Each structure stands twice: as C-alpha cells, then as structure tokens.
Amino acid sequence: MFINRWLFSTNHKDIGTLYMIFGAWAGMVGTGLSILIRAELGQPGSLLGDDQIYNVVVTAHAFVMIFFMVMPIMIGGFGNWLVPLMIGAPDMAFPRMNNMSFWLLPPSFLLLLSSSMVEAGAGTGWTVYPPLAGNLAHAGASVDLTIFSLHLAGVSSILGAINFITTIINMKPPAITQYQTPLFVWSVMITAVLLLLSLPVLAAGITMLLTDRNLNTTFFDPAGGGDPILYQHLFWFFGHPEVYILILPGFGMISHIVTYYSGKKEPFGYMGMVWAMMSIGFLGFIVWAHHMFTVGMDVDTRAYFTSATMIIAIPTGVKVFSWLATLHGGNIKWSPAMLWALGFIFLFTIGGLTGIVLSNSSLDIVLHDTYYVVAHFHYVLSMGAVFAIMGGFVHWFPLFTGYTLNDTWAKIHFTIMFVGVNMTFFPQHFLGLAGMPRRYSDYPDAYTTWNTISSMGSFISLTAVILMVFIIWEALASKRVVKSIPLTSTNLEWMHGCPPPFHTFEEPAFIKSSIK
C-alpha cells in the first residue's frame, strides 16, 4: 500500500507533497553549504582548505538551491498541488509522467553529490565555463557527473513543463477561457514554456562540453577551431530564462496571497498582470548576453543588450504597482503569509533596482564578478523566490495538511528570517562597490568588517530555518483543524475543504460564469 501510494503515485497531490519534502530536504543541504561559505568568509584566512574545495562548495550550493530546492518546490510542489485544483481538473494530463518527473530528481541529486566526492570535485561555479571545466583544469569524473546530473534534472523539468502546458490548455472546464484562470496558473504555464524552450539549449551546451572533455571534440577549444564564448552564449541563453523560471511562479503566488489578505475579490489589473508575465517571459530570452559584457562584444551589441535588459523593468514595474494597488483600500489582515508577501515586494524591488544598475554595460564592466552581483541575485532569489515559497507555504499549509500553523511563531520566524537575509546580503553591495571579487575563499583585510557582518547574518538565517522545522512539527503535533475558509471567485482551490479528498473533480466541473 505504502509503495503503491508513494513510489508509483499518479496523484497530483501526493506527487506535489513528494516534491515539497524533497525540496525542503535539498534546501537544508543548500543552506548547510551556504553556511560553509559564510564560515570561510567570516574572517580573513583559511578555514576549509584551498580554493578548489571552496569553489566545489559554492558550485554545489548554487545547483542544489536552484535545481533541487526552488524549482521542485515552486513548480513541482505548488504547481502540482494547486494547478489542477485551481482549474477544476481531476489530475494532471499525464499522471505517470508526472511521477517520473519527480523520481528523476533523487538520482540527479545523487549524481551531483557524488561529483563532489570523486577526484577534486567540480569547482567550476554553476556556470561550468570551459576551459576551467575542460579535462585539463578539471581532470577526472567530477564535471562529467555534474553534467549528467544536469541532464537528468533537465529531462525532469522538460517533462514537467510538457505536462503543465497540456494540463492548463486542455483540462479547463469548457466554460472558462485562458483569461479566466487564476494568475498562479498563468505563471506556471509561462514558466513551463520558458523551461521547454531554454533547457534543450543547456542540454546541447553541456553535451558539447562532455564530448570536448571525453571524445576529443573542440567545440569550445580554440586549438581546434572552437570558441569558449560559444559555450557562454549557449549557457546564458538557458541561464537567463532560468532566473525568470525561478521567480515567475513566485509572482503568481504573491498575487494570490496579496489579493486574499487584502480582502479583495480579485487582484488589481488582472489582464495587465498576465500581459506583464508574458512580456517578462518573452524578453527573458533576448537579453542573455548581459551576463557577458566583459567578453569583448562590440559596442552596438552591448547597447542593444543594455536597452533590452532595461525594458524588462517595465512589466516588472507593472506587477509591483499592481500588487500595491491590490493592497490599496483593502481590509488588510497582517497574517504571516501577508508579511512574507510584503517582504517579497519590498526586497524584490531592491533586487530589481540593483539589476537596473548592472544592466548598464559600462558599469557592469566594473561590477562584473564582484559581490555586487552576488548581492543583486540573492536579493531576488534568497528574498524573492524564498519569500514567495515561504508565503505560499504558510498560506496554503492548511490546504495541504488540514492543520493550522501557530500564527505567533510564524510571525517570529518571518522576523528572524527578514533580519538574517538582509544582514547577510545588504553589506555585500558595499563589498562589491569596493571591488571584492566573487568565488575567492579569502580576501584583503580591508574587506573584513562587512564580511563578518554578512556571516553573522547567515547564522541568523540558519536559526530561522531551524525554527521553521519546529513550527511545522508544532502544527502537525497540535492538530488544530481548519474551521472554514471564505470562498471567493479567486480562491477555488479551497472548495473541497482542508485537506481536499484524494480525488477531486472526478466529474467535470460546471462553472457558471458571470464575467462579461
């Protein structure tokens, strides 16, 4: 029974739960790695050993957080749980493929972990640039194992993307159009399209790297007529859409949370929100070379990528101001989920502003590969994606489990996390402006003060992570059941009670639409 339910599952709720548990576990691994990084950088001098082991930790931290924490939780966990409920579908379009998408992840994770245990590990950074990732600078199996890990994670995501696109397009009730589906459903569909279009390019790039390393090809080796810059183009054509893949489902969740706790029936500017997400998805594909301003592109190319990158700020601004407009005049309930959403809006906006700074190719020449970039993307990921995940988790926890969290503990947890991440990443802007480069395990004494503060902040965040484990335990142990959830036209996922039955919408849903 246990094996049939959890190993061979074809139920979107169970698979969503598996994704959540896997993502939470991977998140702890990733947090542990980040603590190692900050412990090393907490003061000058060496802690872990040489820079190779340090860079292996940095690389693993990035891969674990991106491919095994944020994506499985947002797309696999929340996506699987909520999309069928929100559109009134009995399950996903391809339930067995859904199961395979999940079970490709543990082997992928295993390959990534084993890559750090053989030879010297893959100390390439998550970008895996040749020639550093070639078979001279990284002899041995480490990088090959990392590449295979990425292949598996990529196949998992592509299959999941196909599944979500098919589900969302084909499994809505006949009465509703795509423009009547909730914003979270939209965000997952756009994310799935981005995955489907970008991951094959990554697969091509890392497969060429694999053959360069093992089969004597020279795709990225100038000695044989190749070009390492080609790899960078292929990688970032995936890598930039990837960062939007990480944040778009968060946009969808934040829209739901802000609407719900403002006491509104619908988010402000629904069509504008949809348009903004589609624009971000499209523009995300034509700005990739802003990661490569230092490789010697000519001035016209840099001018284009600077302008195109700045244009993304417009749809992003539409979203931020629409969230603020949704709040406006509302009867605001200061629940923990609302705090996460407000924290998201504030900190994501700061991250966006530093992104606008970095989009200037001339400035980026100076700031590229400094801690300013690290601060920028951790503001949008560690405080954008993670805050959205936390907000979504505390908001939908009663739906997933049938139990309520302790409000006071949840608010304390938010406060500790908020202080921790800001103390960790705000000083890194100063380090970057002062010229401290990324991916080094040591630094001149002049950088000590801000690094020490940053490392203290990371330990505060660690206590928040540990407290969250306690909060979830407390909720599951106390078993406070949900009384009732006020239903509006925009939160139909609660319709079947908390938690919903194993099978929902076994008969096709009938939607009586009053939208003109």
UniProtKB/Swiss-Prot annotation:
Q: Where are the transmembrane segments?
A: 12-40, 51-86, 95-117, 141-170, 183-212, 228-261, 270-286, 299-327, 336-357, 371-400, 407-433, 447-478
**Binding residues for heme a3, per the UniProt record?**
376
Cofactor binding summary note: Binds 2 heme A groups non-covalently per subunit.
Where does this protein reside within or beyond the cell?
A: Mitochondrion inner membrane
Annotated GO CC locations: mitochondrial inner membrane; respiratory chain complex IV
What is the E.C. number? 7.1.1.9
For the ligand (Cu cation), the binding residues are 240, 290-291
Any one biological process term the GO annotation gives: electron transport coupled proton transport
Q: Where does Na(+) bind?
A: 40, 45, 441
Co-factor(s): heme; Cu cation
Residues exposed to the Mitochondrial intermembrane side: 41-50, 118-140, 213-227, 287-298, 358-370, 434-446
Q: PROSITE patterns from the entry?
A: COX1, COX1_CUB
Task: Note the subunit structure.
Answer: Component of the cytochrome c oxidase (complex IV, CIV), a multisubunit enzyme composed of 14 subunits. The complex is composed of a catalytic core of 3 subunits MT-CO1, MT-CO2 and MT-CO3, encoded in the mitochondrial DNA, and 11 supernumerary subunits COX4I, COX5A, COX5B, COX6A, COX6B, COX6C, COX7A, COX7B, COX7C, COX8 and NDUFA4, which are encoded in the nuclear genome.
Function text:
Component of the cytochrome c oxidase, the last enzyme in the mitochondrial electron transport chain which drives oxidative phosphorylation. The respiratory chain contains 3 multisubunit complexes succinate dehydrogenase (complex II, CII), ubiquinol-cytochrome c oxidoreductase (cytochrome b-c1 complex, complex III, CIII) and cytochrome c oxidase (complex IV, CIV), that cooperate to transfer electrons derived from NADH and succinate to molecular oxygen, creating an electrochemical gradient over the inner membrane that drives transmembrane transport and the ATP synthase.
| Name this polypeptide is given | Cytochrome c oxidase subunit 1
Answer yes or no on keyword Mitochondrion. Answer: yes
UniProt keyword terms in alphabetical order: Calcium, Copper, Electron transport, Heme, Iron, Magnesium, Membrane, Metal-binding, Mitochondrion, Mitochondrion inner membrane, Respiratory chain, Sodium, Translocase, Transmembrane, Transmembrane helix, Transport
- The enzyme's first-digit EC class, named in words, is translocase
Q: Which gene encodes it?
A: MT-CO1
Q: In which pathway does it act?
A: Energy metabolism; oxidative phosphorylation
Catalytic activity of the protein? 4 Fe(II)-[cytochrome c] + O2 + 8 H(+)(in) = 4 Fe(III)-[cytochrome c] + 2 H2O + 4 H(+)(out)
Residue ranges that the UniProt entry lists as topological domain Mitochondrial matrix: 1-11, 87-94, 171-182, 262-269, 328-335, 401-406, 479-516
Q: Which residues bind O2?
A: 244
